[in-house]
Amino acid sequence: MRASSILPQSGYMVFADEILEISDGYASCAFSVKEDSPFTENGELGSYAYMEIMAQCIGVYSGYRNDGEARLGFLLGVRNLDISRASLKVDERVITTARQSVSDGEGLYIFDCEIRCGDEHIASATLSVMNPNDEMLKSING
């Protein structure tokens, strides 16, 4: 399944191509670096994109939990960020996993995420995110 079908991002802002696996508390997505992306420079995508790649894997999980509906989410914090490689090359395919470790039942979640290219660890981090319900979104938007 195409990840873009349940993500709020579109076009060049999508950093998850395909949903590989999704279950209760877990998502796995594939992403290939595009040569024509405005974020690709000299044939590489820098490590600055890694947190967004991880966050979009969480976004895929959120969309799955909301019956395929793309929902707005907020990245609140990143802990234990470990980057093993400074960039990804054009056409490299990475696999991102997101495993939920905490949920408060009100829209606050913590996920342990990892990006791998084959057997190589690229990056990992613990992301705190908020997936607001409709009532909370209305109060945010005024």
Where are these regions (language model features)?
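Short aromatic-glycine motifs in intrinsically disordered, low-complexity regions
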Residues: M1-S10
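Beta-strand-rich interaction surfaces with strong enrichment in secreted/lumenal proteins
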Residues: S4, A16-E18, I83-S87
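Catalytic strand-loop segment that frames the active site of acyl-thioester-processing enzymes
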Residues: S10-G46
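Hydrophobic core residues within well-ordered beta-strands of beta-rich domains
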Residues: M13-F15, V94, Y109
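Conserved positions in beta-strands of structured domains
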Residues: L20, S84, R99-S101, R116
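Compact, glycine-rich, soluble single-domain proteins
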Residues: N42-V60, L75-L76
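Hydrophobic beta-strand-centered segment that forms part of the acyl-chain substrate-binding groove
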Residues: V60-T97
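HotDog/MaoC-like acyl-thioester-processing domains
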Residues: K89-V90, S101-G142
